[in-house]
Regions:
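Catalytic cores of nucleotide-sugar-dependent glycosyltransferases that transfer UDP/GDP/TDP-activated
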Residues: 1-201
Length: 201
């Protein structure tokens, strides 16, 4: 277990992940962190409350932060429902997750040396870190690594995806040759373009 091994060498590891619908809150002893929750993220002109829950992996002495929102993650899986139908708002979910993680790290006043992004749901984080959050003390000196997995979605993202992901500090030029509709390969390429290192499975 890589995070545990790094933690045992005296480094601090914090894990952030979406609070998928199949995660049992009672069994895993998740609890909401009120001081971190309560912020609204505006995506596509709509307010979405950011709820932060935390659990501990006792054996590794490591905390896991769960990014939650009733609309995007409650009772929902990673990419598709139980019938294999992909969620139409996967693009908004990815925007919410990436921004939710970065806002939580800011609130924690934590300055990670390395931010390791795993899979397509994290693909917007490298762009946000290098452009929209580049002057934030938490991210100013951080290196970003993106791991590509075979966790692809089959459909394209919504036609207004580029507009949804825009934040202050990001220009259309920063999106390079991102053409809509955006598919899995184009989304991963955007992540790779803004990462300091890439790991391919």
């Amino acid at each position: 277990n890589l995070p545990q091994a790094i933690q045992e060498k005296g480094r601090e590891i914090r894990t952030f992940m979406p609070k998928w619908g199949n995660i049992n809150e009672r069994r895993n002893q998740l609890h909401e962190v009120i001081r971190l929750s309560g912020m609204n993220l505006i995506i596509d002109d709509t307010d979405h409350p950011l709820i932060i829950k935390v659990a501990s992996i006792q054996s590794a002495r490591m905390q896991v932060y769960f990014i939650d929102n009733d609309d995007y993650f409650q009772n929902r899986m990673q990419t598709a429902d139980e019938n294999g139908v992909e969620y139409e708002d996967n693009d908004s979910r990815a925007v919410f997750y990436a921004r939710g993680v970065l806002e939580t790290v800011k609130k924690l006043r934590w300055c990670p040396d390395v931010i390791h992004c795993h899979g397509w749901m994290t693909a917007l984080a490298p762009l946000y870190i290098k452009k929209a959050y580049k002057d934030e003390p938490s991210f100013r000196d951080a290196k970003v690594v993106f791991s590509v997995y075979e966790d692809d979605f089959k459909n394209t993202l919504s036609d207004d995806f580029a507009a949804k992901l825009m934040l202050k500090g990001i220009s259309k030029k920063d999106l390079g040759d991102l053409k809509e509709p955006v598919d899995y390969a184009a989304l991963c390429k955007l992540a790779v373009d803004y990462s300091d290192g890439v790991i391919q499975n």
